[in-house]
Amino acid sequence: MSGLLDLLEIRKAYGDTRVLEGVALSLAPGEVVSLLGPSGCGKSTLLRIAAGLDDDFQGTVERNPILGFGPDGENGRSGGIGVVFQEPRLLPWLTVAQNVGFADGWLEDEHWVERLLADVGLAGCGGLLPKQLSGGMAQRAAIARGLYGRPQVLLLDEPFSAVDAFTRMRLQDLLQDVVQNYEISVLLVTHDLDEAFYLADRVLLMGGRPGHIRREFHVPLARPRDRRAVELAYLRGEALTEMQRAHVL
Protein backbone atom coordinates (compact mmCIF):
# COMPACT_ATOMS: atom_id res chain seq x y z
CA MET A 1 0.00 0.00 0.00
CA SER A 2 1.25 3.50 -0.79
CA GLY A 3 -1.66 5.90 -0.46
CA LEU A 4 -2.08 9.13 1.47
CA LEU A 5 -3.19 7.05 4.43
CA ASP A 6 -2.51 3.33 4.88
CA LEU A 7 -3.75 1.09 7.69
CA LEU A 8 -1.97 -2.25 7.88
CA GLU A 9 -3.17 -5.29 9.82
CA ILE A 10 -4.98 -3.26 12.46
CA ARG A 11 -6.01 -5.20 15.55
CA LYS A 12 -7.78 -3.76 18.57
CA ALA A 13 -9.14 -5.18 21.81
CA TYR A 14 -10.88 -3.85 24.90
CA GLY A 15 -9.59 -6.17 27.59
CA ASP A 16 -10.41 -9.70 26.44
CA THR A 17 -12.88 -8.49 23.80
CA ARG A 18 -11.40 -8.20 20.32
CA VAL A 19 -13.10 -5.51 18.22
CA LEU A 20 -10.85 -5.37 15.12
CA GLU A 21 -8.85 -8.17 13.54
CA GLY A 22 -6.40 -7.78 10.67
CA VAL A 23 -8.01 -4.75 8.99
CA ALA A 24 -6.11 -3.15 6.12
CA LEU A 25 -7.07 -0.26 3.87
CA SER A 26 -5.47 2.44 1.75
CA LEU A 27 -6.78 5.89 0.84
CA ALA A 28 -5.49 7.34 -2.44
CA PRO A 29 -5.32 11.06 -3.34
CA GLY A 30 -8.75 12.37 -4.30
CA GLU A 31 -10.47 9.10 -3.38
CA VAL A 32 -13.62 8.63 -1.31
CA VAL A 33 -13.80 5.37 0.64
CA SER A 34 -16.83 4.32 2.69
CA LEU A 35 -16.62 1.96 5.66
CA LEU A 36 -20.06 0.34 5.65
CA GLY A 37 -21.38 -2.00 8.29
CA PRO A 38 -23.73 -2.52 11.23
CA SER A 39 -23.27 -1.01 14.66
CA GLY A 40 -20.59 -2.72 16.72
CA CYS A 41 -18.38 -3.92 13.86
CA GLY A 42 -15.55 -1.48 14.69
CA LYS A 43 -16.03 1.18 12.01
CA SER A 44 -15.76 4.19 14.32
CA THR A 45 -12.91 2.61 16.26
CA LEU A 46 -10.99 2.16 13.01
CA LEU A 47 -11.60 5.79 12.06
CA ARG A 48 -10.34 7.00 15.44
CA ILE A 49 -7.17 4.97 14.89
CA ALA A 50 -6.77 6.50 11.42
CA ALA A 51 -7.21 9.98 12.91
CA GLY A 52 -4.57 9.40 15.57
CA LEU A 53 -7.15 9.65 18.37
CA ASP A 54 -6.54 6.09 19.58
CA ASP A 55 -3.01 4.72 19.92
CA ASP A 56 -3.87 1.58 21.89
CA PHE A 57 -3.88 -0.91 19.00
CA GLN A 58 -1.68 -3.34 17.13
CA GLY A 59 -0.69 -2.84 13.51
CA THR A 60 0.62 0.12 11.55
CA VAL A 61 -0.78 3.46 10.40
CA GLU A 62 1.30 5.04 7.65
CA ARG A 63 0.72 8.66 6.68
CA ASN A 64 2.22 10.04 3.48
CA PRO A 65 4.82 12.76 4.25
CA ILE A 66 2.65 15.22 2.31
CA LEU A 67 0.26 15.18 5.27
CA GLY A 68 2.95 16.87 7.33
CA PHE A 69 3.41 19.89 5.07
CA GLY A 70 3.37 23.27 6.77
CA PRO A 71 1.15 26.24 5.84
CA ASP A 72 3.45 27.19 2.98
CA GLY A 73 3.37 23.75 1.38
CA GLU A 74 2.30 22.93 -2.14
CA ASN A 75 -0.78 24.89 -3.27
CA GLY A 76 -0.79 26.71 0.08
CA ARG A 77 -2.27 23.68 1.82
CA SER A 78 -1.26 22.78 5.33
CA GLY A 79 -1.84 19.10 4.71
CA GLY A 80 -2.84 16.94 7.62
CA ILE A 81 -6.15 15.35 8.50
CA GLY A 82 -9.52 16.91 9.28
CA VAL A 83 -12.18 15.09 11.31
CA VAL A 84 -15.97 15.50 11.39
CA PHE A 85 -17.90 13.60 14.06
CA GLN A 86 -21.47 12.34 14.25
CA GLU A 87 -22.44 15.34 16.37
CA PRO A 88 -21.24 18.86 15.49
CA ARG A 89 -19.57 19.46 18.88
CA LEU A 90 -19.66 23.24 18.46
CA LEU A 91 -18.61 25.27 21.49
CA PRO A 92 -21.82 27.02 22.60
CA TRP A 93 -20.15 30.23 23.84
CA LEU A 94 -18.40 30.90 20.51
CA THR A 95 -19.91 32.17 17.28
CA VAL A 96 -20.08 29.95 14.22
CA ALA A 97 -17.06 31.72 12.70
CA GLN A 98 -15.07 31.34 15.91
CA ASN A 99 -15.92 27.64 16.05
CA VAL A 100 -14.69 27.14 12.49
CA GLY A 101 -11.40 28.97 13.09
CA PHE A 102 -10.89 27.96 16.70
CA ALA A 103 -8.30 25.27 15.97
CA ASP A 104 -5.83 27.76 14.51
CA GLY A 105 -5.56 30.57 17.00
CA TRP A 106 -8.88 32.36 17.05
CA LEU A 107 -9.56 33.39 13.49
CA GLU A 108 -6.10 34.07 12.16
CA ASP A 109 -7.61 33.85 8.68
CA GLU A 110 -11.05 35.43 8.73
CA HIS A 111 -11.29 35.53 4.93
CA TRP A 112 -10.74 31.77 4.75
CA VAL A 113 -13.46 31.23 7.36
CA GLU A 114 -15.86 33.38 5.34
CA ARG A 115 -15.10 31.40 2.18
CA LEU A 116 -15.61 28.07 3.95
CA LEU A 117 -18.93 29.18 5.40
CA ALA A 118 -20.06 30.32 1.96
CA ASP A 119 -18.98 27.02 0.41
CA VAL A 120 -21.00 24.98 2.92
CA GLY A 121 -24.10 27.15 2.53
CA LEU A 122 -23.68 29.29 5.65
CA ALA A 123 -22.81 32.64 4.12
CA GLY A 124 -23.74 35.42 6.55
CA CYS A 125 -24.10 33.02 9.49
CA GLY A 126 -20.65 33.53 11.02
CA GLY A 127 -21.96 35.76 13.80
CA LEU A 128 -24.63 33.35 14.99
CA LEU A 129 -24.30 31.17 18.08
CA PRO A 130 -24.68 27.38 17.77
CA LYS A 131 -28.05 27.46 19.56
CA GLN A 132 -29.40 29.54 16.67
CA LEU A 133 -28.61 26.83 14.11
CA SER A 134 -30.71 23.91 12.94
CA GLY A 135 -29.17 20.45 13.09
CA GLY A 136 -28.26 20.56 9.42
CA MET A 137 -26.72 24.01 9.72
CA ALA A 138 -24.67 22.93 12.73
CA GLN A 139 -23.28 19.97 10.79
CA ARG A 140 -22.41 22.26 7.87
CA ALA A 141 -20.43 24.36 10.34
CA ALA A 142 -18.68 21.21 11.56
CA ILE A 143 -17.70 20.34 7.98
CA ALA A 144 -16.31 23.86 7.51
CA ARG A 145 -14.31 23.45 10.72
CA GLY A 146 -12.94 20.15 9.44
CA LEU A 147 -11.76 21.93 6.28
CA TYR A 148 -10.27 24.97 8.02
CA GLY A 149 -6.74 23.56 8.21
CA ARG A 150 -6.76 22.83 4.46
CA PRO A 151 -6.39 19.08 5.04
CA GLN A 152 -5.54 16.56 2.36
CA VAL A 153 -7.67 13.94 4.11
CA LEU A 154 -11.11 14.34 5.72
CA LEU A 155 -12.38 11.64 8.08
CA LEU A 156 -16.12 11.54 8.77
CA ASP A 157 -17.80 9.40 11.44
CA GLU A 158 -21.48 8.96 10.49
CA PRO A 159 -21.75 12.74 10.02
CA PHE A 160 -25.33 12.80 8.72
CA SER A 161 -27.03 10.18 10.88
CA ALA A 162 -28.57 12.67 13.32
CA VAL A 163 -30.53 14.72 10.75
CA ASP A 164 -33.74 14.05 8.84
CA ALA A 165 -33.73 12.30 5.46
CA PHE A 166 -34.08 15.45 3.34
CA THR A 167 -31.35 17.30 5.21
CA ARG A 168 -29.18 14.20 4.95
CA MET A 169 -29.46 14.19 1.15
CA ARG A 170 -28.57 17.87 0.96
CA LEU A 171 -25.52 17.30 3.16
CA GLN A 172 -24.47 14.32 1.04
CA ASP A 173 -24.61 16.54 -2.04
CA LEU A 174 -22.59 19.13 -0.16
CA LEU A 175 -19.93 16.52 0.56
CA GLN A 176 -19.77 15.64 -3.13
CA ASP A 177 -19.14 19.32 -3.89
CA VAL A 178 -16.45 19.47 -1.21
CA VAL A 179 -14.64 16.47 -2.71
CA GLN A 180 -14.61 18.08 -6.15
CA ASN A 181 -13.87 21.67 -5.14
CA TYR A 182 -11.18 20.94 -2.56
CA GLU A 183 -9.59 17.90 -4.26
CA ILE A 184 -9.65 16.10 -0.95
CA SER A 185 -9.56 12.43 0.06
CA VAL A 186 -12.37 11.18 2.30
CA LEU A 187 -12.81 8.20 4.61
CA LEU A 188 -16.49 7.98 5.55
CA VAL A 189 -17.98 5.74 8.25
CA THR A 190 -21.65 4.93 7.66
CA HIS A 191 -24.29 2.27 8.21
CA ASP A 192 -26.43 3.67 5.37
CA LEU A 193 -26.27 1.60 2.15
CA ASP A 194 -27.54 4.44 -0.05
CA GLU A 195 -25.08 6.93 1.40
CA ALA A 196 -22.10 4.60 1.12
CA PHE A 197 -22.52 3.90 -2.59
CA TYR A 198 -23.75 7.36 -3.57
CA LEU A 199 -20.66 9.05 -2.17
CA ALA A 200 -17.79 6.59 -2.47
CA ASP A 201 -15.37 5.37 -5.11
CA ARG A 202 -14.87 2.23 -3.03
CA VAL A 203 -17.07 0.70 -0.35
CA LEU A 204 -15.48 -1.58 2.25
CA LEU A 205 -18.13 -3.79 3.82
CA MET A 206 -17.28 -4.57 7.44
CA GLY A 207 -18.82 -7.16 9.71
CA GLY A 208 -18.19 -9.80 12.30
CA ARG A 209 -16.87 -9.65 15.82
CA PRO A 210 -14.02 -8.94 15.86
CA GLY A 211 -14.67 -6.59 12.96
CA HIS A 212 -12.98 -7.19 9.63
CA ILE A 213 -13.48 -6.26 5.98
CA ARG A 214 -15.70 -8.85 4.33
CA ARG A 215 -15.81 -7.46 0.81
CA GLU A 216 -14.76 -4.49 -1.29
CA PHE A 217 -16.99 -2.85 -3.92
CA HIS A 218 -15.83 -0.44 -6.62
CA VAL A 219 -18.21 2.30 -7.78
CA PRO A 220 -17.23 3.22 -11.38
CA LEU A 221 -19.40 6.32 -11.69
CA ALA A 222 -18.26 9.89 -12.29
CA ARG A 223 -19.49 12.80 -10.20
CA PRO A 224 -21.98 14.36 -9.89
CA ARG A 225 -24.05 11.21 -9.51
CA ASP A 226 -27.72 10.39 -9.90
CA ARG A 227 -29.18 8.62 -6.86
CA ARG A 228 -31.47 6.68 -9.24
CA ALA A 229 -28.60 5.22 -11.27
CA VAL A 230 -29.09 1.54 -12.10
CA GLU A 231 -25.45 0.85 -11.25
CA LEU A 232 -25.94 2.12 -7.70
CA ALA A 233 -29.06 0.00 -7.24
CA TYR A 234 -27.17 -3.09 -8.40
CA LEU A 235 -24.24 -2.47 -6.04
CA ARG A 236 -26.58 -1.86 -3.11
CA GLY A 237 -28.27 -5.16 -3.87
CA GLU A 238 -24.93 -6.98 -3.96
CA ALA A 239 -23.95 -5.48 -0.61
CA LEU A 240 -27.32 -6.35 0.91
CA THR A 241 -26.97 -9.95 -0.25
CA GLU A 242 -23.50 -10.18 1.28
CA MET A 243 -24.75 -8.73 4.58
CA GLN A 244 -27.63 -11.22 4.67
CA ARG A 245 -25.24 -14.07 3.88
CA ALA A 246 -23.02 -12.99 6.75
CA HIS A 247 -26.02 -12.64 9.11
CA VAL A 248 -25.16 -9.03 9.92
CA LEU A 249 -28.69 -7.74 9.28
From Swiss-Prot:
GO terms for molecular function: ATP binding; ATP hydrolysis activity. It comes from the Bacteria. Gene3D superfamilies: P-loop containing nucleotide triphosphate hydrolases. Residues 5-233 form the ABC transporter domain. ATP binds at G37, P38, S39, G40, C41, G42, K43, S44. Its EC number is 7.6.2.14. It catalyses: ATP + H2O + aliphatic sulfonate-[sulfonate-binding protein]Side 1 = ADP + phosphate + aliphatic sulfonateSide 2 + [sulfonate-binding protein]Side 1. The complex is composed of two ATP-binding proteins (SsuB), two transmembrane proteins (SsuC) and a solute-binding protein (SsuA). Belongs to the ABC transporter superfamily. Aliphatic sulfonates importer (TC 3.A.1.17.2) family. This is Aliphatic sulfonates import ATP-binding protein SsuB 2. It comes from Pseudomonas aeruginosa (strain ATCC 15692 / DSM 22644 / CIP 104116 / JCM 14847 / LMG 12228 / 1C / PRS 101 / PAO1). The lineage of its organism: Bacteria, Pseudomonadati, Pseudomonadota, Gammaproteobacteria, Pseudomonadales. The gene is ssuB2.
